[in-house]
Amino acid sequence: FSLVTILDYIERTHTYYLSKRLHEIEQTIDLLIKSYDKSHPLLLALNSFFLEYKSRLATHIKAEESFMLPYIKSLLKFEKHEINVQDYFVTTKDNSMDKILNAHDDVELDLAKMRETLVSTETHETSKTLYRILITQLESFEKDLLVHGLVEDRVLIPRAKQLEENLNEIFSEMIRWN
């Protein structure tokens, strides 16, 4: 796949996660909480954990969409001669894939802890179906995030770094000739 296609996949999954997947899980947690007569301490902690996770994931996505993805798009534009040397220099002088990656964190693993806690929890009969739904949602989202992370870490980032290196060589050659 081209880098443009991979970038499109990353952006679309970000939108899907924020607009659909996270809301579905949050709704299931709300239904679970409401299914108990009294507040269930584990569910309240789970809800708090999930809201914090949702916020961290949104921050992670915003950082990628504010820095990493536009930077890669700029590299692609320069490669296709859609931006000039000055614009390329402005874009890259304070940025690099290495700098961006130093600020990049993995948020995929936290869902496993949440799911494992749920699996080990005793439920009452009226909420078993909701627990199973939530566990299935978490497993599915966890797998989806794993694939998303692998595409970023093993395809997008190495190819973007290679493109950056190639363009830096071209840029260095241009400077030598001028």
Please place each PLM-identified region on the residue numbering:
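Small-residue-biased structural context
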Residues: F1-N178
